[in-house]
Amino acid sequence: IGKRLSGRDRLDEQRAALDEIAAICDAEKVDLVLVAGDVFDTFLPSAEAEDAFYSAAKKIAGTDRCMLIISGNHDDNIRLTAATALSEELGIYVYGNAGHIPKLCGGRRVYPVEAGANHIVFRTGEEEVFFNVLPYPNETRLKEDKNPDEKFLDKMVRWMNVGQAENKKNLPSVFLSHLFI
């Protein structure tokens, strides 16, 4: 959101596309919307782009749907997760910071029943699904890792395995990430 084309502002078109996504979610009775990064076009999106995103996310989540969002390479992971105290109350769960554990909020058709730094489990009725999440591994996260000499691909596989190891109930599993391989 916020991308310009040849210097031309496209925010109105982006808002219209997001409104269409919200309408499709309502018409199709979508339970959960996944966003695998690159919410914004830049680390420092305009206030208008941020407003478009937060307004659209609230509309898409509605009153009984959840959203699961992870940061991409164009997103500032800290900035993207800055509003989690508010967004989680609206059923919008954002992973960007390594170590952030979402607050479990119910009251929706689909709701989280378990969450950790790299996973979240959603339930609807009697069914549960496990999400192993790996936001874009930015340079800061790579530097914080304890194995600086490990190859990038090996590191990604290890991080995926750490997340998957949290699936103690052997639930159906979805891996959600934003990677370059």
Give names to the regions the model predicted.
Residues 45, 75-181:
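His/Asp/Glu-rich metal-coordinating catalytic cores
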